[in-house]
Regions:
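Mid-domain Rossmann-like dinucleotide-binding core that forms the NAD(H)/NADP(H) cofactor-binding site
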Residues: 134-211
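Short Gly/Pro-enriched turn/cap motifs at secondary-structure boundaries
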Residues: 7, 18-19, 50-55, 103-109, ...
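Short amphipathic alpha-helix with an adjacent loop that forms part of the alpha/beta core around
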Residues: 212-223
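Glycine-rich beta-strand-centered segment in the early N-terminal region that forms part
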Residues: 20-34, 45-90, 130-132
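Short SAM/SAH-binding signature in class I
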Residues: 225-229
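Cytochrome P450 core scaffold surrounding the K-helix E-X-X-R motif
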Residues: 39-43
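Short, well-ordered coil/turn residues at beta-beta hairpins
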Residues: 33, 81, 209, 231-232
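NAD(P)H dinucleotide-binding glycine-rich loop of Rossmann-like/cofactor-binding domains
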Residues: 86-165
Length: 232
């Protein structure tokens, strides 16, 4: 099968690798869509593990199942989590699952024709997609989950003023989610084009990051923000 293997940000190669057959508790999925996360292009984070196949925001369909898999069948449209926390380590017991110190299985990268899903992720990290969600839309499930968790930790509530610094994909998801909670949204970025999108997504006030943001915030909102979310 074909994969896009990352060696560094200036060296990505299309290579052939064997297509692995699923074990008794595993499934093989065919990748239909795969998003590009900001972390996929952060070299200092990726280089120690290079070369690697990136991509953890995927929409896929089940191609083959192991003989002991009963919850999924070929043809099922699924979302597969990139990793599953152990639920038992110090961090997991404190609710900090993203920094689990005992993660054993990670999803192989989605920049490939097929991905073999290990048994732990089949059991605890694979979800059927409703017909209303397209494969492209399903690539937003993982980043949206990060946004939901962040706003839960921040305790964002209706009526609060929320300042979002950075209007890339994550920042715009924060805008949509906070707007659904009837919050007042102020967004800032160094890129004017991103501020246009923030405005379209529902930001009440957009400010160029090169300006005096605190001063503008006080002048236009009458007070400082209740919550600041950093996405830059």
């Amino acid at each position: 099968m074909k994969v896009a293997k990352w060696y560094n940000n200036h060296d990505i190669r299309i290579e052939d690798v064997p297509k692995t057959q699923p074990g008794r508790n595993e499934i093989l999925v065919k990748i239909i869509s795969c998003g590009i996360c900001g972390s996929d292009i952060v070299e200092w984070y990726r280089l120690p593990r290079a070369p690697l196949i990136p991509g953890h925001e995927i929409g896929d369909v089940v191609l083959e199942t192991g003989e002991s898999v009963s919850d999924y069948k070929p043809g099922d449209r699924v979302f597969v989590a990139p990793k599953v926390p152990c639920l038992n380590c110090y961090y997991c017991t404190k609710g900090n699952h993203p920094v689990c110190s005992e993660v054993a299985d990670r999803l192989p990268g989605g920049f490939a024709e097929y991905v073999l899903v290990p048994d732990s992720i089949v059991t605890n990290g694979t979800y059927l997609l409703p017909d209303s969600i397209t494969y492209d839309q399903s690539t937003f499930i993982e980043p949206l989950a990060c946004v939901v968790r962040a706003q839960k930790l921040a305790g964002i509530r209706e009526g609060q003023t929320v300042l979002i610094i950075g209007c890339g994909m994550s920042g715009l998801l924060h805008v949509k989610l906070a707007k659904s909670k009837n919050c007042k949204l102020i967004t800032t970025d160094i890129n004017p084009r991103k501020l246009v999108y923030a405005d379209r997504f529902g930001s009440d006030i957009t400010v160029d990051a090169g300006e005096n943001v605190p001063e503008i915030l006080l002048a236009r909102n009458g007070r400082k923000a209740d919550v600041v979310i950093l996405c830059a």
